[in-house]
Amino acid sequence: MNVKARKEILLIALGGNALIRKGQAGTVSEQFENLKVPIGQIARLSRDYRIIITHGNGPQVGNLLLQQECCDAVPALPLEILVAQTQGEIGYMIESTLDSELMELGID
């Protein structure tokens, strides 16, 4: 019986400020661009480790809260819903960028 050695687990935390750099407006295209370097490094690390990625969302949820407060035409959403929205948004950006990097490196 050929038993494959299990890879060690590596936990990586990306702060919300890793996606929005100082002086940037925080557009989605800027955030995707800012993810390329750290996600490229994570993709390469995945050859040797099982990866768990966690992330913050402070700047993103703050921006969404400001958007909510700027419009009286629609009901504002509570903060916990905005947190969930931005977590999903950032999770999608990470997953999409990671998938592209893994395909480029030929990693399943």
Which positions does each model-derived feature cover?
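Ligand-binding beta-strand-loop-alpha-helix segment within the catalytic cores
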Residues: 70-108
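N-terminal glycine-/serine-/threonine-rich phosphate-binding loop
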Residues: 1-57, 63-69
